[in-house]
Amino acid sequence: MQARALLLAALAALALAREPPAAPCPARCDVSRCPSPRCPGGYVPDLCNCCLVCAASEGEPCGGPLDSPCGESLECVRGLCRCRWSHAVCGTDGHTYANVCALQAASRRALQLSGTPVRQLQKGACPLGLHQLSSPRYKFNFIADVVEKIAPAVVHIELFLRHPLFGRNVPLSSGSGFIMSEAGLIITNAHVVSSNSAAPGRQQLKVQLQNGDSYEATIKDIDKKSDIATIKIHPKKKLPVLLLGHSADLRPGEFVVAIGSPFALQNTVTTGIVSTAQREGRELGLRDSDMDYIQTDAIINYGNSGGPLVNLDGEVIGINTLKVTAGISFAIPSDRITRFLTEFQDKQIKDWKKRFIGIRMRTITPSLVDELKASNPDFPEVSSGIYVQEVAPNSPSQRGGIQDGDIIVKVNGRPLVDSSELQEAVLTESPLLLEVRRGNDDLLFSIAPEVVM
């Protein structure tokens, strides 16, 4: 028995002696000699920590002396590589995967084939129809993405004449516009909101939003030579807005989208390309024009005037204005709109300096409410309005009864969303009937703005 044990030990020693020794790691790692394998399970460093070798995929053996380590998000369980997570996931390619590891394996394959990885969109199975996201219809529908982004800020505008005898609204013109501020400032063409009609009666502007809400509007500023106007509505809540881009950056051949409401068909969309961003007005027969227009083949119809012309980032680069013939339309560049708005703002600032009610104010925001409640637990529950930070001594507000800490919630019956609305009312209206929240009380004050000479 002892002899047999000695014999087995000798045979084992002989087998070990015949096994080739493990290759020593090089003193210096030469990555140029590393293989370039394609590994569905990902990569791990080799024993010398020099080259990357294939990791074991899900379901492959692991833990043995010659087995590769498990790949990303895998762990060795009872000799096999298993995923650390068992829940299904939805990928950005619209497919449902059994677990995160299956998605990562698919992402590695996609990277090798197309260079586009697959990301996790959500836990659980993909919603019905999401698998279509990888189809050409969804992949290349960039125009639909632009329209979805900008449509809520495009409005329909109608100009009526209120007949003095019959009380009926006689339509004079209609067109489009787009919202520039959350408080309801809208940009459109001057010819959409003005009329040379000699018929008696009072002209009225009506604005309809995409959600169907309608408001009366007033003209804030108008430049008939440039054919640009701003009008103002008083919404009950903050509105979606569009941002102005730089028309100077436009290139011929660039895709553009025109949107408006021709014939009262709201949010009618046409697309085209920019032919030129510098078509002189004199070339179009506009002798008094000093403006360069954007020429495009996007169709602009009657009623589309005043709507935005946007680039693929959803930025407004022009106002739809003229249609010469089929395939040739023109827009006022956004850089000219910016200049018009700057001049309007400068004029407002000058007028603001001439009329005042004597308060320092801040627009109510959730962060401001939290800040004020921290110092005053009895601060009222409000979601919008104007916080009176300070009342100037001997000012119209102080004489009228306004106090520090008051919250002005309405002016002349209109809810206040932004401080600019109160500033506009100070410039254009007198007296001002202010509805004020003071503690738990709702108070009314009549304030007459003073003019500074």
From Swiss-Prot:
Entries under SUPFAM superfamilies matching the protein? Growth factor receptor domain, Kazal-type serine protease inhibitors, PDZ domain-like, Trypsin-like serine proteases
Q: Per the record, which residues fall in region Serine protease? A: 175-340
Q: Which GO terms describe its molecular function?
A: endopeptidase activity; identical protein binding; serine-type endopeptidase activity; serine-type peptidase activity
User: Where, by residue number, is the active site?
Assistant: 191 (charge relay system), 227 (charge relay system), 305 (charge relay system)
Summed up, the tissue specificity of this protein is: Widely expressed, with highest levels in both adult and fetal heart, ovary, uterus placenta, and bladder. In the endometrium, expressed in epithelial glands and the stroma. Also present in leukocytes. Isoform 1 is predominant in heart and skeletal muscle, whereas isoform 2 is predominant in placenta and kidney.
**Family matches, as Pfam families:** IGFBP (PF00219), Kazal_2 (PF07648), PDZ_2 (PF13180), Trypsin_2 (PF13365)
* Domain (PDZ) ranges: 359-444
- Spell out the subunit comment: Homotrimer. Interacts with TGFB1; the interaction inhibits TGFB-mediated signaling. Interacts with BMP4; the interaction inhibits BMP4-mediated signaling. Interacts with TGFB2 and GDF5. Interacts with MYH9.
Query: What family does this belong to?
Result: Belongs to the peptidase S1C family.
Q: Which protein are we looking at?
A: Serine protease HTRA3
User: Which species does the entry assign this protein to?
Assistant: Homo sapiens
